[in-house]
């Protein structure tokens, strides 16, 4: 693993430090200020007649990003989590320690510097070193500074390198953290209680998806990594909680692309005595809150598309197919005509698809990508909404919506089905679909039906994909750009290093 000549040179330097009685992996030394705090606290130094303040002494830490050796002195750029600070080191102060530093220090090493603030002739506020310690010797050279880390695959597989070399990547994940904490704060302010439900399920449910399967040794049973927390959260509504939410991982054993990762984060929330129309208004308030928290304008650019949050609209499923998808009513209203139309358009349609699934195929191909501004699409076919409440006026549609922004689904919500007999029949229909070969059809969950039979109040529930939300609000083009360690196809580890020093 460490046979490369450049790595061997660095290992030799680490051993040389040990021979001098220095630990190349020190512990216990503390900084007094972050680099940003140092620059803020001592900004006044640049205005002094003699731009230095020897009475002040601070300790800073970070990774060496740039090293310029000049005989009896050197300038070093040291970066902590957020800020680069220049360090000046002179043989006059460090004596023999300076020789050791010149011999052993390299770009990538993590250091602690103790010294006083001063400004260079060019006016750059810096720290003049009185002590210098290598805290962690880097034995693998970092990618070259000016070209960064451009190999996309390597960036995802070795995210630590990506974070070191590309500061903008770190900014994305800081924004992700802010988005998640802001979503949590919003729901707490709205009176929702955060809960945690199981990650391993005896029966996968809550979504139409293929599960990951594991085995519980102590119980001697198969378990499924959860595809959604929905059925457990609704059990809590049965139990008497009236507003709950959960932010956590879901796992779906399916394909991967720029907007799908098999392990992803969602928020799901359930609200007793409310309807899906209430969820639409709640979602609008959530986005207003997030835009304000992130200091974003109501108009944002995503993938070269202008998204205007002031132009939010609501449209029914069939109206969207007609007015946006361009499919006439006489085609949409007849199953055989719709099938013929899809085939004429060159769309591969699986045999024996139900009318509702044919409508879904048409929607996916002709409508979804055109929904740029926030669009709540309502009145979904009941056949593709097995957990949603049946509409009182039209039993063929569900009291359900999906929110689309920038051509992608961001949220799914509905008035919940709380009739246990209807739910049992829909589960039976899903089982029949699974027996026909639909791997994503839902399983029968009699325990959930039994819970419903104890009475669940009228409830509205919704899920929002956190990863897609972060993509939208940060401008990331791939879901891999907003997940620190995304799923990747296995490759043989290649630890070879070509020095870029």
Swiss-Prot record:
Cellular localisation: Cytoplasm
Binding site for Mg(2+) 1: 402, 409
Entry superkingdom: Bacteria
GO molecular function terms noted in the UniProt entry: ATP binding; lysine-tRNA ligase activity; magnesium ion binding; tRNA binding
One GO-annotated biological process of the protein: lysyl-tRNA aminoacylation
Example of a GO cellular component annotation carried by this entry: cytosol
Keyword annotations of the record: Aminoacyl-tRNA synthetase, ATP-binding, Cytoplasm, Ligase, Magnesium, Metal-binding, Nucleotide-binding, Protein biosynthesis
Pfam families associated with the record: tRNA-synt_2 (PF00152), tRNA_anti-codon (PF01336)
Catalytic activity: tRNA(Lys) + L-lysine + ATP = L-lysyl-tRNA(Lys) + AMP + diphosphate
Main enzyme class: ligase
InterPro entries recorded: Aa-tRNA-synt_II (IPR004364), aa-tRNA-synth_II (IPR006195), aa-tRNA-synth_II/BPL/LPL (IPR045864), Lys-tRNA-ligase_II (IPR002313), Lys-tRNA-ligase_II_N (IPR044136), Lys-tRNA-synth_II_C (IPR018149), NA-bd_OB-fold (IPR012340), NA-bd_OB_tRNA (IPR004365)
Residues annotated for Mg(2+) 2 binding in this entry: 409
Obligatory cofactor(s): Mg(2+)
Coiled coil: none
EC number: 6.1.1.6
NCBIfam families membership: lysS_bact, PRK00484.1
Assembly information from the UniProt record: Homodimer.
UniProt name for this protein: Lysine--tRNA ligase
Species name: Helicobacter pylori (strain ATCC 700392 / 26695) (Campylobacter pylori)
